[in-house]
Amino acid sequence: FAKKLNLPENHSYTRAALLGALAVKEAIFQANLKLDGDTGFISGTSVGGMDATETYFKDFSEGKTDNNRFIRAQHPGFTTEKIAEYFEVNGFVSTISTACSSGANAIMLGARMIKTGKLKRVIVGGTDCLTKFTLNGFNSLMILSNEQCKPFDENRKGLNLGEGAAYLVLE
């Protein structure tokens, strides 16, 4: 993903930030948007940079750590900040972290910001990556399915986790 964004090999983007940046890039392209100071960015995420936590734990176990990198990358807002930084969005930038509804809440907040005249346009959506933390959390609830996803089937056996990102431009 980093190559598609022309990032250096030693970049500090988490997987969630990379997924998000690619989705934002696509949204900007599809909207034929020219970013300016009137553009806001609201991003939803459940676990944000949790993949950085897993990397940190591995590094810690091997005796090679960078606490500052870990502290910055672990909070959900870091993902939003890295994406906004990449696209040079310097206006209103906010993170919504309300579990599975984060992206939907980002869209609702963006629409309200436009409706009330606080923003002319805003990029809204969400990003999350699959991590051991997330997988183990849902596994501990014993609600994961080992079968193919079939959400509307009355014989479904649980849920299937995934990762992804989606953003759109509201004006």
Regions found by a protein language model. Name each.
Residues 29-38, 48-171:
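Acyl-thioester C-C bond-transforming condensing/cleaving domain
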